[in-house]
Every structure is written in C-alpha cells, then in structure tokens.
C-alpha cells in the first residue's frame, strides 16, 4: 500500500456481447483458472435463460438482481480496551457492487442444478424476485449491523 500517491483503478473494458462493464466484471468474478471464454458462455447462457423467463432485457434483469443483493451496511471488528466490538459501517458504492457479485456467484455455485449456467440463471432470477441465498445473505448482514447499532459511535 503506497503512501505517496493514490493508486489508479484499473479500467475494465465493457464485455463484447452487451457492451456493459457490470457484465464484464461479473465474467471476471465467475472465471476460474483464466478460462474467460468458459465464464462468458456460462454467464451469457444464464442471462439468456433469465430473459426468456421474465421477457425483459438481460442486462436490466442482472442489474435489478444485483440491486436486490447490494448491502447498505456491514459490520467491521474494532478493538476497544481489550474487547472487540462489531461496529456497523456504511458500505462504499464500489464495494456494494463487488460484494453483490461475489455473493451471487458464491450462492449460485452452492445450488443443486446441473450446469453452472442453470445455477447462475436460478440465482439471478431468485435475486430478481427478492428471494434466494444471496438476498438472505444481504438481510443477515443488515440484521447484524442493526443488532450492533449501539456500537455505531465507535465508527472511524
């Protein structure tokens, strides 16, 4: 972590099919062992499946799903006088999106469908309808922050 100057954020180019940076970022999160084309196939297939079921633009479905997963608050550990408190803090906009994407992919992989495409499509549709494990994770995160509201004055 350099002290002299702010490190420039790497720019992610929009994906080739939808021309959207959010989709490109999600492809990068899904990707394993550098197999980007496999990750793209899985995500594009999932978005097509989702758009067939809802009859809406695939990118709109994805963005609404991510909006339903994004956490507004989270807790961070803060040590004060020998005891550790879970202090609720607001989540930065960039982190909200990346957490939402990570949770979406994580809980999609935990699903019981056969293919990755089906798993992703299922989790995207569940998030779109405010259901599913990723949305539950957001709710749990918010509950945790709400429960520890008394320690909010320890924010830094």
Curated annotation (Swiss-Prot):
<dbReference type="InterPro" id="IPR005717">
    <property type="entry name" value="Ribosomal_uS7_bac/org-type"/>
</dbReference>
<keyword id="KW-0820">tRNA-binding</keyword>
<dbReference type="InterPro" id="IPR000235">
    <property type="entry name" value="Ribosomal_uS7"/>
</dbReference>
<dbReference type="GO" id="GO:0000049">
    <property type="term" value="F:tRNA binding"/>
</dbReference>
<dbReference type="GO" id="GO:0015935">
    <property type="term" value="C:small ribosomal subunit"/>
</dbReference>
<keyword id="KW-0689">Ribosomal protein</keyword>
<keyword id="KW-0699">rRNA-binding</keyword>
<dbReference type="InterPro" id="IPR036823">
    <property type="entry name" value="Ribosomal_uS7_dom_sf"/>
</dbReference>
<dbReference type="Pfam" id="PF00177">
    <property type="entry name" value="Ribosomal_S7"/>
</dbReference>
<dbReference type="InterPro" id="IPR023798">
    <property type="entry name" value="Ribosomal_uS7_dom"/>
</dbReference>
<dbReference type="GO" id="GO:0003735">
    <property type="term" value="F:structural constituent of ribosome"/>
</dbReference>
<keyword id="KW-0687">Ribonucleoprotein</keyword>
<comment type="subunit">
    <text>Part of the 30S ribosomal subunit. Contacts proteins S9 and S11.</text>
</comment>
<comment type="similarity">
    <text>Belongs to the universal ribosomal protein uS7 family.</text>
</comment>
<keyword id="KW-0694">RNA-binding</keyword>
<protein>
    <recommendedName>
        <fullName>Small ribosomal subunit protein uS7</fullName>
    </recommendedName>
</protein>
<dbReference type="GO" id="GO:0019843">
    <property type="term" value="F:rRNA binding"/>
</dbReference>
<comment type="function">
    <text>One of the primary rRNA binding proteins, it binds directly to 16S rRNA where it nucleates assembly of the head domain of the 30S subunit. Is located at the subunit interface close to the decoding center, probably blocks exit of the E-site tRNA.</text>
</comment>
<dbReference type="GO" id="GO:0006412">
    <property type="term" value="P:translation"/>
</dbReference>
